[in-house]
Amino acid sequence: MFSRAGVAGLSAWTVQPQWIQVRNMATLKDITRRLKSIKNIQKITKSMKMVAAAKYARAERELKPARVYGVGSLALYEKADIKTPEDKKKHLIIGVSSDRGLCGAIHSSVAKQMKSEAANLAAAGKEVKIIGVGDKIRSILHRTHSDQFLVTFKEVGRRPPTFGDASVIALELLNSGYEFDEGSIIFNRFRSVISYKTEEKPIFSLDTISSAESMSIYDDIDADVLRNYQEYSLANIIYYSLKESTTSEQSARMTAMDNASKNASEMIDKLTLTFNRTRQAVITKELIEIISGAAALD
C-alpha cells in the first residue's frame, strides 16, 4: 500500500515541473516578443526625435525674422487703440494647428481655448464662426462645433509655412463672404524648447479699422491704401502665428519622442531583467530534474 502511494506521489511530483517548464517557456517567448516589439518602437521614436530636432532647428532660425511681421502689424491695433463697437455681433475665431500628431497637448490646448472663447462669445450674444488651420483642429471640434466652421485648411505642418501660405489663408478668409466685425487668432507661442504658451491675438475687419476714431485724424489715407494695409497686416499676423505654432509643435514633438524613447528604455530594462530571471528559473528546474533523476537511478 505504501509503495503504491509512493509511486503515485512520485508521478505527481514528476509531472508538475513539466507543466511549470512549459509555462515558463511560453512566458519566455512572450517576453522575447515584447522585447522585440518595444525595441522596434524605440528605433522609430529615436528616428522621429532626430527628424523633429532638425525641423525644430530650422523653425527656430526662421521664427525670429517672422516675429517682426506679426509684432509690427499688431502694433497698429495697439497704438491706434482700435476697438470694435459693442453693437457689432459677428466674431471670427482662427485656430492654428497642423495635420500631424505625436506632439503632446499642442493641438488640444488650442482647441480648449477656442471652445472657451466660443462659449463666452455665444453667451454674450455674438455670432461666432471658426476657421481651422490644420486638420487636428477640425477633428477635435467637429463633433461639438461643426455648424460654426467656415473653412478648414489641410496639408499644414508637412513643410515649413511660408508667407505665401499665410496669404492664401487670408485671401480665402476675405473671399469667404463672411463679413466679420472682429476676430481673434489662437495659436501656441514658442517660449523655449520645453515650454510654449497658448495665446490669442486680435484681428479686425476693414470697416472696424476705418471707422476707428484714431484713424479719422489721417485725412490723406486713401480707402484703397487702408484696405491693402488691412489685408497685408492680416496675412502678416497669420504668418507670424504659423511660425510660432510650427516651432512650438516641433519642440513639443522632439520632447515627446525623447520621453517615449526613455520610457522604452525603462521597459526594455525591466523586461530584460524579467527574462533573465525566468530563464534562470527554467535552467534551475531543469538541473533539479537532472540531479533528481540521476539520484533515483543510483
Curated annotation (Swiss-Prot):
Keyword Transit peptide included in the entry's annotation: yes
N6-succinyllysine found at: 49, 115, 154, 270
Recorded family membership: Belongs to the ATPase gamma chain family.
UniProt gene name: ATP5F1C
Record SUPFAM superfamilies: ATP synthase (F1-ATPase), gamma subunit
Assembly, per entry: Component of the ATP synthase complex composed at least of ATP5F1A/subunit alpha, ATP5F1B/subunit beta, ATP5MC1/subunit c (homooctomer), MT-ATP6/subunit a, MT-ATP8/subunit 8, ATP5ME/subunit e, ATP5MF/subunit f, ATP5MG/subunit g, ATP5MK/subunit k, ATP5MJ/subunit j, ATP5F1C/subunit gamma, ATP5F1D/subunit delta, ATP5F1E/subunit epsilon, ATP5PF/subunit F6, ATP5PB/subunit b, ATP5PD/subunit d, ATP5PO/subunit OSCP.
Role, per record: Subunit gamma, of the mitochondrial membrane ATP synthase complex (F(1)F(0) ATP synthase or Complex V) that produces ATP from ADP in the presence of a proton gradient across the membrane which is generated by electron transport complexes of the respiratory chain. ATP synthase complex consist of a soluble F(1) head domain - the catalytic core - and a membrane F(1) domain - the membrane proton channel. These two domains are linked by a central stalk rotating inside the F(1) region and a stationary peripheral stalk.
GO MF terms held by the record: proton-transporting ATP synthase activity, rotational mechanism
Example of a GO biological process term: proton motive force-driven mitochondrial ATP synthesis
PTM annotation (Phosphoserine): residues: 146
Entry keyword set: Acetylation, ATP synthesis, CF(1), Hydrogen ion transport, Ion transport, Membrane, Mitochondrion, Mitochondrion inner membrane, Phosphoprotein, Transit peptide, Transport
Gene3D superfamilies per record: 3.40.1380.10, ATP synthase, gamma subunit, helix hairpin domain
Subcellular location: Mitochondrion inner membrane
Organism, scientific name: Bos taurus
Recorded topology in the membrane: Peripheral membrane protein
A Pfam family recorded for this sequence: ATP-synt
Modification type N6-acetyllysine: residues: 39, 55, 115, 154, 197
Residue runs in coiled coils: none
Presequence range in chain numbering: 1-25
GO annotations of cellular component type: mitochondrial inner membrane; mitochondrion; proton-transporting ATP synthase complex
Keyword check for Transit peptide: yes
Protein name in UniProt: ATP synthase F(1) complex subunit gamma, mitochondrial
